[in-house]
Amino acid sequence: MSIRAEEISALIKQQIENYESQIQVSDVGTVIQVGDGIARAHGLDNVMSGEAVEFANAVMGMALNLEENNVGIVILGPYTGIKEGDEVRRTGRIMEVPVGETLIGRVVNPLGQPVDGLGPVETTETRPIESRAPGVMDRRSVHEPLQTGIKAIDALVPIGRGQRELIIGDRQTGKTSVAIDTIINQKDQNMICIYVAIGQKESTVATVVETLAKHGAPDYTIVVTASASQPAPLLFLAPYAGVAMGEYFMIMGKHVLVVIDDLSKQAAAYRQLSLLLRRPPGREAYPGDIFYLHSRLLERAAKLSDAKGGGSLTALPFVETQAGDISAYIPTNVISITDGQIFLQSDLFFSGVRPAINAGLSVSRVGGAAQIKAMKKVAGTLRLDLAAYRELEAFAQFGSDLDKATQANVARGARTVEVLKQDLHQPIPVEKQVLIIYALTRGFLDDIPVEDVRRFEKEFYLWLDQNGQHLLEHIRTTKDLPNEDDLNQAIEAFKKTFVVSQ
């Protein structure tokens, strides 16, 4: 058998053509310093700001400081296994989190890794944690109400879909309870809720998850948690991760509520990172871009125009105050970014007014646009009644002789305070809220003793379920008040059955 040179050369050419190079080109640097959750690396010349990088022990990091001779990297995990001289590798991707329907009902950390012990999250889609907020032309004004189920909020400081409403108050004034009740009330409201817990005890987060599960909320809720024991970079990233997960649904035309509990702890974590990265400190040792930290996050909440699918992302950020001081640095920053604030006051909380909302300092800059027509009609005078009552309350306590009109104002105010009280985790449908506030503002409760008002309200709801379904249905479907004569007759009929306590 003779060997033919042409065949050999043809085979060699074929081999060369089919040869695939296995060489991988990657940008690799060397760790020159590590400690306190921060690493400095030399050699990552082309790394981007905010890019994810990988250390030799598979722990991820994020490039934050791009300096002349080195890169400052925050380590997103335990840093004890990283040492000087270790390799650090670029990924070429800006920091991103997994997104999608499969996250609903899960508890994840800010990197999207499950922490609930229910196995991996099956999703292939990701979104960068930082993205540009929708532009002016991509938005439309907020016009759909987000029903919280809390009378004091839905009547006095209404929240609309796509709004950013700050919840501010001292610790232990019921901020988290307001958020949980709002999430519970979104059942059957076509809403996806994301609860972001920053710097809280793991036991507290477990209690919140348990409460949500008890009320069937996991069917539409994602919990993102960066607990107090986690490294500061994860606390800093948590709200961005939560909003990125929400944006995925908003772009698909769905409605999303993101609760951020709370931004004070995120600001403290960012301050810690900035000081460790040797960025120059400013007021209260916060870095100069602390305002931008929160503004670029909250600007991503929006109500999209119909051309963009009409989805919305509503943000409820929390800020914790010290001794009720809302004029401190972080509170004033966030107040100026958001579309209003709900101020929870510890004095009211301890005096039994719960939710402890200070109606005078709380405001919604969207206002009536975020209320149904019926609520707008009945709740118009409520804020004035409360303000007048708070003013006259001091005089009434001294027992000084008051004229008839003032006495009537004080009596109405006391009943208003009672009606706005609410039990924990018992959100009330808006149609029932409208009817009890109608009864209050039209004077039907004026002859009911103050101590009986809460019982009157509970029994009135039960009576409506039995005998007033047509009234509730009318408000539900038309969003407007039924015929006032029918309403008055119904309330009078119930009052005849109500027994005042002796």
From Swiss-Prot:
It catalyses: ATP + H2O + 4 H(+)(in) = ADP + phosphate + 5 H(+)(out). The keyword Translocase applies. One of its GO terms (molecular function) is ADP binding. It is a peripheral membrane protein. One of its GO terms (cellular component) is plasma membrane. It is an enzyme of class 7 (translocase). NCBIfam families: atpA (TIGR00962), PRK13343.1 (NF009884). The keyword Plastid does not apply. This is ATP synthase subunit alpha. Produces ATP from ADP in the presence of a proton gradient across the membrane. The alpha chain is a regulatory subunit. The gene is atpA. The record marks 362 as: Required for activity. Its main location: membrane. Its EC number is 7.1.2.2. It is found in: Cell membrane. F-type ATPases have 2 components, CF(1) - the catalytic core - and CF(0) - the membrane proton channel. CF(1) has five subunits: alpha(3), beta(3), gamma(1), delta(1), epsilon(1). CF(0) has three main subunits: a(1), b(2) and c(9-12). The alpha and beta chains form an alternating ring which encloses part of the gamma chain. CF(1) is attached to CF(0) by a central stalk formed by the gamma and epsilon chains, while a peripheral stalk is formed by the delta and b chains. Belongs to the ATPase alpha/beta chains family. ATP binds at residues 169-176. Keywords: ATP synthesis, ATP-binding, Cell membrane, CF(1), Hydrogen ion transport, Ion transport, Membrane, Nucleotide-binding, Translocase, Transport.
